[in-house]
């Protein structure tokens, strides 16, 4: 092998070493491109220019960093759905329970709220969702995952749920129940630009399908969480084949308008 060939070989080895050391640098997790199907649906409901480049991502160690349980208001701009163009201000509130326990309620919309609890392992779970406009509360067993601690980038967790729909005017009355097949996925980390600013976020996709009474239910949600901020963008797509059971207008996109 001549001197020129040795030089080229040495240069190639050095280049590979640089690339490898960069990808293995401390604190640098995998970079997971946004899947094409997700990109298309998210873009259609959040608008162009909101989702930027994929970023290095890491396992979720402390779920509360991505959704801090502190009382505050969030102002979102609605980007798709029947209220497109409107602003909505919702709240994260806590309530005391016997024995000193704390319960949390987060408003996804002015009339739609999720009830959040923390497990001993640090997971944030949503135990129920209420819609005061329709006068119903929906329970799922096990509870819906919101932010899970220790889940890894690209990991999916699938599980089965029981669901019941109860009426606020008569909580003991349960006309409809059913079963769902759900999948919770840590899709990756992406730069997000919204009116409130530009953030590095993690993207969680939560999807389920099944039957509630005679209705076929298909639901997918995408949640973008920024550390120490919480939700900065979300898309909810719901398809219920029998709206006369109950109807929640959750086919919407929203972006954080005020930090």
Residue ranges and their predicted role:
Residues 2-13:
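Bacterial N-terminal signal peptides that target proteins for export
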Residues 28-121, 130, 166-259:
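Acidic, serine/threonine-rich low-complexity disordered tracts
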Residues 18, 45-48, 160-162:
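Short hydrophobic/aromatic-rich motifs at helix boundaries and adjacent loops
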Residues 112-175:
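Extracellular-facing segments of soluble proteins and assemblies that are Gly/Ser/Thr-biased and enriched
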Residues 22-28:
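Signal peptide processing junction and immediate N-terminal pro/mature segment
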Residues 11-21:
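Bacterial N-terminal signal peptides
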């Amino acid at each position: 092998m001549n001197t020129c060939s040795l030089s080229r070989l040495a240069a190639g080895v050095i280049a590979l070493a640089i690339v490898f050391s960069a990808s293995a640098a401390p604190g640098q997790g995998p970079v997971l491109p946004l899947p094409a199907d997700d990109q298309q649906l998210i873009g259609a409901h959040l608008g162009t220019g909101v989702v930027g480049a994929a970023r290095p991502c890491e396992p979720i160690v402390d779920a509360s960093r991505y959704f801090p349980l502190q009382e505050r208001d969030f102002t979102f701009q609605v980007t798709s759905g029947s209220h497109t163009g409107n602003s909505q201000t919702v709240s994260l509130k806590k309530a005391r329970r016997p024995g000193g326990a704390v319960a949390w309620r987060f408003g996804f919309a002015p009339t739609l709220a999720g009830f959040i609890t923390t497990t001993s392992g640090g997971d944030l779970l949503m135990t129920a969702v209420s819609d005061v406009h329709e006068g119903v509360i929906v329970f799922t067993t096990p509870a819906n995952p919101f932010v899970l601690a220790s889940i890894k980038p690209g990991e999916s967790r699938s599980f089965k749920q029981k669901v019941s729909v109860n009426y606020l005017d008569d909580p003991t009355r349960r006309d409809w129940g059913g079963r769902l097949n759900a999948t919770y996925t840590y899709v990756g980390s992406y730069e997000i630009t919204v009116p409130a600013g530009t953030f590095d976020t993690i993207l969680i996709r939560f999807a389920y399908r099944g039957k509630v009474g005679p209705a076929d239910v298909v639901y997918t949600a995408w949640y973008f969480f920024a550390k120490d901020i919480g939700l900065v963008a979300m898309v909810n797509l719901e398809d219920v084949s029998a709206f006369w059971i109950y109807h929640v207008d959750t086919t919407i996109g929203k972006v954080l308008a005020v930090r």
